[in-house]
């Protein structure tokens, strides 16, 4: 899908230059931005598959409405590419202002596609007042999205890293490498599942596996080529050929999302699963969606991590309001609220040593859940492959193993 998107975008770029927005707020004039934002409605296109995340977005919307007079409408997505396609359709129709999408929760290949074809407003992120708190030195992912420099075209708002989780009442010693996972699955058929790509968690499992199995993982940081792709992925397909018949339902069906994995474990159908939020198992336990015996861990060789971003399309109708919302999402208050496992449990992008004592206290007061790893236990996250790898992996996985929705 992303490859088709890029082809369409390239054709559009050749057909006509991008028109400027009728009104483009100056990101450095914050007083003017907040003034222009008042009364605007921001249509924030964001994944809507988690109640905890949806509740957080609703909370953020209530806060910016009360403080700045900005209304936030959460347009719930199953796939971020749907929002990108909407912007492409508007570009094709010549709608270069007044677009339907004001803010997108985005990263990876979707950001790369929009950046390449000039479909993003900006740069603006580093002009936000709350940018001063972002941990640029300690978290390289906040300025490099799947190896693609962000260059101020998107603002980070959360950190994520793969964790595996298991019910210790049924699985005391889980597998701690990708090869060991296969051995365990063959001995315990039907007790592991991952979501069906292109669900982002399912696709991330493929990337985690190929990083561990590829003869030379360093090639994954560069744009994919035919030669590098076939050499790096041959062990992955051999691995999945062996793993698939030992998955939940014998690989004949796949969960459609991370929340579905939680439900399967709670129902006793699987013993091992994964999440891209280290706090999600604790959050689920707190909400009585998982048994209290569930615990999380990372693989011995480390796990993939990245940052989540928000971006503003070039033709957004409420650019000022989107800037105000993005800035609020970077505030210590919003970041600490989001990191609380009882709320969402998503990691902060802020540097603690840049915060006031009062704001640091917000984070110090957060209690880690029973299934949440400490930063030391998580370890340093492995970098994401270049986004072009994800496109190819999803296409080939679907051709080899894809099943009907």
Regions found by a protein language model. Name each.
Residues 160, 239-243, 289-311, 360:
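Periplasmic-binding protein-like
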Residues 111-113, 274-291:
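A ligand-binding cleft/hinge motif common to bilobed small-molecule-binding domains
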Residues 22-28, 263, 370-405:
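Conserved C-terminal helix/tail region of periplasmic/extracytoplasmic solute-binding proteins
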Residues 47-59, 74-82, 97, 101, ...:
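Extracytoplasmic ligand-binding site segments that recognize negatively charged/polar headgroups
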Residues 87, 114, 261-266:
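Hydrophobic residues within well-ordered alpha-helices
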Residues 303-304, 308-377:
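Mature extracytoplasmic/periplasmic domains
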Residues 27-38, 42-45, 50-71, 164:
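Short, polar/charged alpha-helical segment
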Residues 1-20:
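Gram-negative bacterial Sec-dependent N-terminal signal peptides
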């Amino acid at each position: 899908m992303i490859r088709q998107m890029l082809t369409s975008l390239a054709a559009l770029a050749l057909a006509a230059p991008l028109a400027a927005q009728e009104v483009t707020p100056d990101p450095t004039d914050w007083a003017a931005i907040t003034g222009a934002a008042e009364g605007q409605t921001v249509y924030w296109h964001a994944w809507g598959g988690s109640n905890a995340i949806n509740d957080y977005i609703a909370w953020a919307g209530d806060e910016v409405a009360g403080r700045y007079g900005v209304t936030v409408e959460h347009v719930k997505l199953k796939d971020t590419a749907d929002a990108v396609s909407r912007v492409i359709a508007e570009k094709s129709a010549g709608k270069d202002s007044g677009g339907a999408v004001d803010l997108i929760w985005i990263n990876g290949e979707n950001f790369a596609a929009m950046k390449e074809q000039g479909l993003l407003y900006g740069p603006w992120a580093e002009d936000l007042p709350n940018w001063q708190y972002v941990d640029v030195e300690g978290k390289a992912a906040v300025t490099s999205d799947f190896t693609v420099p962000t260059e101020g075209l998107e603002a980070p708002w959360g950190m994520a890293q793969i964790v595996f989780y298991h019910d210790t009442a049924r699985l005391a010693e889980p597998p701690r490498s990708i090869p060991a996972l296969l051995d365990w699955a063959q001995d315990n058929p039907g007790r592991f599942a991952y979501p069906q790509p292109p669900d982002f968690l399912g696709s991330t499992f493929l990337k985690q596996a190929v990083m561990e199995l590829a003869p030379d993982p360093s090639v994954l940081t560069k744009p994919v080529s035919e030669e590098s792709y076939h050499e790096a992925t041959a062990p992955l397909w051999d691995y999945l050929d062996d793993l698939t018949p030992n998955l939940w339902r014998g690989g004949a069906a796949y969960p459609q999302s991370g929340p579905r994995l939680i439900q399967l474990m709670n129902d006793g159908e699987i013993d091992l699963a994964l999440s891209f939020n280290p706090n999600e198992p604790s959050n689920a336990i707190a909400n009585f969606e998982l048994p209290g015996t569930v615990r999380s861990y990372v693989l011995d060789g480390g796990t993939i991590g990245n940052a989540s971003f928000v971006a503003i399309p070039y033709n957004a109708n409420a650019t000022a309001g989107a800037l105000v919302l993005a800035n609020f999402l970077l505030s210590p208050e919003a970041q600490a609220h989001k990191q609380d496992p009882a709320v969402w449990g998503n990691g902060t992008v802020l540097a603690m040593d840049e915060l006031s004592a009062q704001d640091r206290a917000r984070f110090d007061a957060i209690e880690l859940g029973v299934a949440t790893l400490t930063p030391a236990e998580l370890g340093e996250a492995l970098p994401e492959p270049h986004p072009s790898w994800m496109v190819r992996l999803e296409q080939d996985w679907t051709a080899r193993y894809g099943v009907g929705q």
